[in-house]
Amino acid sequence: MDRVKEFAMKDQIRAHRMAGRIRHLISRQIETKLRDQLGLVTITEVQVTGDLHHAKVFVTVYGTKDEAQTALKILEDNRANFRRSLGVLKVRFVPTVEFELDRLFEDAGIMDELIQRARESDKRIAAGASGPIDNDATALMDKVVDQEARNPDSWHTAPTSSSHTAGLCLVRASSPIACNIDSTTLCKPRTPGPGL
C-alpha cells in the first residue's frame, strides 16, 4: 500500500512541476508573439493531469467580457503553436493545451460585495434596528448559486458550527468559494473534472 501512495505522490509532484514549466513557456509565448493581439492576459493557474497528457490553462483578461472572449478565442486558435513550443520540455508525450477563463476573481468580487452587505446587516441588527431583508444581496447570492449549481457534481456540503445563518464567507485554501446558507456551507473547490 505504501508503494501505491508513493507512486501517486510522485505523479502529483511531476504534474505540479510540469504545470510550472508549461505556465512559464506559454506566458513567454504570449508575451513575445501575441502581446499586441491579446492585451493584458494573465495566466492564473495551470492544471496538468497525472499522466501529463493534458494541461488546462486558466487565464484572466483585463477588459470587458467581449474582450475576454476575443482573447480566449485567439488563445484557442493558437493552441497548436503553444503545443509546438512545449516540445522543448523533452517529454515522451507533449500535453494538449486547453484554455479557460478564470472566474475566480469575478466570483470573489461578488462574494466581497455580499460579505460587505452582511456586515452592514449585522451592524443594523447589533444596533437593534430591524429592517427589511436585503433583497439585492439575496438576488445576488441566488445568481452565484445558480451559476455554480449547473455543475452539481462539484459541490460539496458540510455543516458549519456558526449559529449566524445569514453570514457569508470567502475561503481561500485551494481556491474554493464558500457561502454560508442555512447553517450549511456550500463549497465549490476548483478541482479537475472527470476529463482533467
UniProtKB/Swiss-Prot annotation:
One GO term of the biological process aspect: maturation of SSU-rRNA
Molecular function per GO: ribosomal small subunit binding
Record key words, sorted: Cytoplasm, Ribosome biogenesis
Keyword hit for Cell inner membrane: no
InterPro entries: KH_dom-like_a/b, RbfA, RbfA_dom_sf
Record carries keyword Cytoplasm: yes
Described function: One of several proteins that assist in the late maturation steps of the functional core of the 30S ribosomal subunit. Associates with free 30S ribosomal subunits (but not with 30S subunits that are part of 70S ribosomes or polysomes). Required for efficient processing of 16S rRNA. May interact with the 5'-terminal helix region of 16S rRNA.
Family: Belongs to the RbfA family.
PANTHER family tied to this protein: RIBOSOME-BINDING FACTOR A, CHLOROPLASTIC-RELATED
Stated name of the protein: Ribosome-binding factor A
